[in-house]
């Protein structure tokens, strides 16, 4: 029986901290499931200098698979560090694997389920914990923000996650889903509202607001000086001092994420609900 190689795959980032945290996650998931889990990015991360990564170069998916295929390894399980079925998983990744299969016809790849699943509220529990950690005396408004996706199914997953978060926080809170950014065109209106616009609405532009970060790893968008932080700073400035925004930590900082990923690994291994063959 061939040994299945497990890869934990994120989208990739030019921020060293993202790759370092991906590695820590892979190690923790590996410990939880009892196998080695290799951290790999879909793209981008090989642009990070090796010294910034502890002198261990980052890997991206296609070369990482090709290297292992040349070593005779043919069976892989990819655990996606993605909230929903983004184009990276439904379009780009299958095309790259099909390309590799032209040279390695015995290549076998299973894709575990994405993080958000309607029957699992643990992502919402992570966000709820992080919201409570930022509570101020009068804080009852929560803007849950993701990157914003051109894929409707990803936006729908975000909206369902916001409903779960609302249920966990209770009726004393108001939870609104928002996007950091979106593409132009009415066909992408499902991404609305943008966080920048939400924080300028009369009912959101004063007092304390918590921005719940539906982001996994630090990088250009998330973190102390990321795009979301700039949006929040701009909204505070536009309010003339009436608005105070508090950002939560990132999802990967919460220990429950390791349990979720371990369960996605188990489901992917047996091709359970949400898993598929690429």
Summary of predicted features, one role per range:
Residues 1-278:
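Extended amphipathic ligand-handling, pore-lining, and cofactor/metal-binding catalytic surfaces
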């Amino acid at each position: 029986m061939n040994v299945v190689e497990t890869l934990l795959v994120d989208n990739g980032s030019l921020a060293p901290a993202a790759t370092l945290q991906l590695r820590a996650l892979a190690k923790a998931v590996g410990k939880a499931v009892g196998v080695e889990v290799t951290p790999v990015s879909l793209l981008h991360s090989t642009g990070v200098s090796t010294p910034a990564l502890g002198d261990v170069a980052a890997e991206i998916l296609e070369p990482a698979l090709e290297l292992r295929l040349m070593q005779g390894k043919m069976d892989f399980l990819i655990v996606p560090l993605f909230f929903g079925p983004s184009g990276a998983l439904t379009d780009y990744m299958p095309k790259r694997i099909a390309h590799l299969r032209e040279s390695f016809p015995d290549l076998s790849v299973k894709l575990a389920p994405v993080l958000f699943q309607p029957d699992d509220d643990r992502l919402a529990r992570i966000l709820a914990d992080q919201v409570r950690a930022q509570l101020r005396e009068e804080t009852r408004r929560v803007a849950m923000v993701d990157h914003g996706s051109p894929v409707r199914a990803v936006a729908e997953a975000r909206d369902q996650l916001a409903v779960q978060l609302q249920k966990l926080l209770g009726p004393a809170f108001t939870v609104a889903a928002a996007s950091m950014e979106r593409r132009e065109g009415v066909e992408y209106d499902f991404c609305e509202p943008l966080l920048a616009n939400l924080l300028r609405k009369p009912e959101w532009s004063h007092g304390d607001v918590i921005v719940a970060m539906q982001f996994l790893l630090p990088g250009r968008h998330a973190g102390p000086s990321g795009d979301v932080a700039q949006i929040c700073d701009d909204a505070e400035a536009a309010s003339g001092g009436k608005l105070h925004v508090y950002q939560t930590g990132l999802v990967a900082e919460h220990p429950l994420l390791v349990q979720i990923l371990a369960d996605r690994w188990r489901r992917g291994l047996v091709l359970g609900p949400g898993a598929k063959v690429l």
